[in-house]
Amino acid sequence: LTVELILGDCLEVMKSIPDKSIDAVITDPPYGMKSHNMRLAVSMMNNDWDENPASDEQINTILDIGKTTVIWGGNYFKLPPSRCWLVWDKKSFDKMTFADCELAWTNVDATVSIFRKSPQNMDGGKVHPTQKPENLMRWC
């Protein structure tokens, strides 16, 4: 197993990565929550972290470099058809906000998967506005 850590601006670094050289790309790119007029918590409205969605070029680069790709918020981008969408069902969790579920596009040839486990490690507070629970990421 070879692991290489690269420090840099991902938008610049991705351009130099050879096609299909990354075993798994799991990403949650900005999809322009403000530009979609989504309901936002007051604390998020004052931040510009998600002002502009990822461009088609950036999404295509993600698709090019990954062998297996998972794109959270994939329903906001122009992506190829997929049989295997991941669905994070958030309805039953009192502390969740915004949507009842979150969708992730994948290039995996499998059936749709629905994640319903409790996000147990979210009680300690978030360090990122779109943070995913650890058990959800393990499930990916």
Locate the predicted segments by residue.
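Class I S-adenosyl-L-methionine-dependent methyltransferase catalytic core
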Residues: L1-W139
